[in-house]
């Protein structure tokens, strides 16, 4: 789909504090003026509740191009940096106020890569999981019904971020955390396992030790298998759709 739209949220910082006031306004004005560098309709910018959004026609180079574009707008040596998160644009932003439960028929995934997001998957209604999204940094989310679509864009963003130092490793870890949470709800065998959180933290420590993108996904894949308490072939035979999606992606 040549017109697939990705949504990037960007936060600017100075000396590890969120950029505000006149300095932020000047930077945003520079960015707006330079958007003409892009082909018409390829990238547009929105601001809402202090957060900056870029809606872009996505292809395999979009993340890198946008990162380079933003780097050029920042004056070297002035201490300004940015972090970027990515999602897929479906129809429009769905505002999700903090601590409000969001339930949607057919909702599979609802997250931005790189966001410091907490997934509370403990609530169930009939056979449908109700996702409760709670996190200080999560103000908006996109509804995604196809894991392969979000993984494709996630993969592109993360490779760009890791290889060019655009994303802090902590953000990469948080991206994995969301997927592990979802997997724990869908394929875990013992829902009353009191040691589950401890086990999860052990997984995160292993991921934290990975220095490179390839080693990260090698460990991540192994953790996914261990988490299900079954072997690959058993899981493939069970035809669990979530596992098959992730299995296909990490392979």
Give short role names for the model-derived ranges.
Residues 3-4, 11-23, 32-251:
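Cytosolic nucleotide-utilizing catalytic cores of signal-transduction proteins
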